Curated annotation (Swiss-Prot):
Species, as recorded: Rickettsia conorii (strain ATCC VR-613 / Malish 7)
Gene Ontology terms: biological process: intermembrane phospholipid transfer
Keywords: Signal
The keyword Signal appears for this protein: yes
Assigned protein family: Belongs to the MlaA family.
Keyword Signal: yes
Cellular compartments per GO CC: membrane
Signal peptide location: 1-18
Protein name in UniProt: Uncharacterized protein RC0123
One matching Pfam family: MlaA
Amino acid sequence: MRILIILSIILCSLSIRADLEYVDNEIYNYNGGSNENGCVEVYDPYEKFNRKVFVFNSVLDYIILRPLAVGYKNITNDYVKARVNSFVSNVDTPLTAINYGLQLNYDKTMKSVWRFLINTTLGIGGLFDVAGKVGLPSDRQTFGSTLAHYGVAPGPYLVLPIIGSTNARDMTDSVITNYALNPLMYYTHNDFDLGVLAVSKINDRYVVLPFSDYVMKNSTDPYVAIRSALHRVREASVQYPENFKCPKPKN
């Protein structure tokens, strides 16, 4: 049983989840950043390699992860899904506080800390978003956001096996934020804990199920559609320095 749960956790970290969860999270946790001085065009010098990895990851997702997400959709009600979403959002909050601290934004750092404390206590471990009802809405920041805050451009677009779509700057999020510093990755003392982690990852995939299904069924080039969506939403969600200008890609 424990081995099966661990396997499901690994599989729930596949590329389409990583790609589309990222888009979804950035859309619904948009922090007011502007893309007026951002990088409009995607720099994809490794497109040939990226496309091959995209196909590989997409096949694994279709065979393994998507069926899990569809099953989760069918056997859970809206109330359960809302509790899981709230719990996962609460787990992300300390990382948001850390990144606002690195950006020297004291006000938002403290708001993130208070949001986490309120939801962890009054919200019963984050199952309920009490803080949001008292003026402390969800606000997601990552290490990639912090690098952008200090003027780091996105760099080359990359699609990595298992990890999924990212760019040179936001690889810190793919590896550090989502895995190394994700508290859920260490909250696995028994089968129940592993089950909680597995459900949270399956929920991540479920959240973007409508978007992923639409792209895969209707887009003439799903690779370009997902690449464009990721880049556009990400650039709109980060806040560059006032005088930042996106560097022109080297030929």
